């Protein structure tokens, strides 16, 4: 299996499977002399970690990260810093239940990558989905924590803005609320609604989709390049690569199709600090290059495909059959996708920042 690496200057390679011994990543291209400890990474991993509420999978993983290479104590200050060499990060798997999947090893789960992996490789890891499992995203979050250190001065924050057909009230958006509920929801009232709504979904054995919004502030103007290295191109690809993501938009995205030119174009004026935009329909990117405004991206996550109702499928021998998925699964995988989306945006920004420096100094 190839294509486990993304990025150009800031490159991330992930490895491991859901029920393997461990998962991890190698970050290559991180500049030297950046303070970095396991604690810097652990905080982000803890936000994504499973089993923290009744609304996520009850698989209990500590997700304790180990830095295997790429750092050392500074000879003068004693502070642990990056050396400029590849940074290897390891996260052990400790709560696998492969027996939960023994009955379906010869059946293709509807909505999962079982059939396509089998069609392409002639073999698949049926134990929790192997490499196609959302378990892999923990490695992205670890890499994203390193990226955040590279883009110091920029702030990347994510929020869950929709579950099923129910959207937040944007007039009530409060970033301070994100840590006060298990949904990463910036609307206090809607978070309470989500709890009741998702309880019903969970108890029925079903699942539901969601929309996540990621906002990057402090992004300087000039990141990205035309034509095939656009910042929004790489953001879309990075977010689309996350498990279960089925759609990505930048700025107003698909809503711009209903706008006129007068409504959509972000007008400008000169302010005391320089050029100012009067709106941000473009999501902080024009012509593939950052404008200096907040970069705004949203992505849609499909409902978790593993549900507790019988489904029609086929087996490896080509026979029609039914399947009932067991195991521990998220009723809304979009919840834990919030820190994953943040990580991917941070990695793309780190990559483009280094590419920008390499081109223009």
Swiss-Prot record:
What does this chain do? This reaction introduces a second double bond into the aromatic ring system.
What does the UniProt keyword field contain?
A: Amino-acid biosynthesis, Aromatic amino acid biosynthesis, FAD, Flavoprotein, FMN, Lyase, NADP
Family under the similarity heading? Belongs to the chorismate synthase family.
Q: Which residues bind NADP(+)?
A: 48, 54
Output this protein's name: Chorismate synthase
Is the Repressor keyword given for this protein? no
Q: PANTHER family attached here? A: CHORISMATE SYNTHASE (PTHR21085:SF0)
One of its GO biological process terms is:
amino acid biosynthetic process
User: Where on this chain does FMN bind?
Assistant: 131-133, 243-244, 287, 302-306, 328
Subunit (UniProt) = Homotetramer.
Q: Which GO terms describe its molecular function?
A: chorismate synthase activity; FMN binding
Instruction: Report the domain of life of the source organism.
Output: Bacteria
Q: How is the cofactor bound?
A: Reduced FMN (FMNH(2)).
Corresponding gene? aroC
Query: A cellular component term (GO) from this record?
Result: cytosol
Pathway(s): Metabolic intermediate biosynthesis; chorismate biosynthesis; chorismate from D-erythrose 4-phosphate and phosphoenolpyruvate: step 7/7
């Amino acid at each position: 299996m190839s294509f486990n690496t993304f990025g150009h200057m800031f490159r991330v390679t992930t490895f491991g499977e859901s029920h393997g011994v461990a998962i991890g990543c190698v970050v290559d291209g991180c500049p030297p002399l950046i303070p970095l400890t396991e604690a810097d990474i652990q905080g982000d991993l803890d936000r994504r970690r499973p089993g923290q509420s009744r609304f996520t999978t009850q698989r209990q993983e500590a997700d304790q990260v180990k830095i295997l290479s790429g750092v050392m104590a500074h000879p003068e200050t004693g502070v642990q810093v990056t050396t400029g060499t590849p940074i290897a990060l390891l996260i052990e798997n400790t709560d696998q239940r492969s027996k939960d999947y023994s009955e379906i090893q010869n059946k293709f789960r509807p909505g999962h990558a079982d059939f396509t992996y089998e069609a392409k490789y002639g073999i698949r890891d049926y134990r929790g989905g192997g490499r196609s499992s959302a378990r892999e995203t923990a490695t992205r979050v670890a890499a994203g924590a390193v990226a955040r250190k590279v883009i110091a001065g920029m702030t990347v924050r994510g929020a869950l803005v929709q579950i099923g057909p129910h959207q937040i009230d944007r007039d009530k958006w409060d970033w301070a609320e994100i840590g006060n509920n298990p949904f990463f929801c910036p609307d206090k009232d809607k978070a309470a609604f989500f709890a009741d709504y998702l309880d019903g979904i969970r108890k029925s054995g079903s699942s539901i989709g969601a929309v996540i919004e990621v906002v990057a502030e402090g992004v300087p103007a000039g990141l990205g390049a035309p034509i095939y290295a656009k910042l929004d191109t790489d953001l879309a690809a990075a977010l689309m690569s996350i498990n279960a993501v089925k759609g990505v938009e930048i700025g107003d995205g698909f809503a711009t199709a209903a706008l006129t030119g007068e409504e959509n174009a972000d007008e400008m004026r000169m302010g005391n600090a320089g050029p100012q935009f009067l709106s941000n329909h473009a999501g902080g990117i024009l012509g593939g290059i950052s404008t200096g405004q907040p970069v705004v991206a949203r992505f849609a996550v499909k409902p978790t495909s593993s549900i507790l109702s019988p489904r029609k499928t086929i087996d490896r021998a080509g026979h029609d059959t039914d399947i009932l998925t067991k195991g521990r699964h998220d009723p809304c995988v979009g919840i834990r996708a919030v820190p994953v989306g943040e990580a991917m945006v941070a990695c793309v920004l780190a990559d483009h920042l280094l590419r920008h420096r390499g081109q223009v100094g």
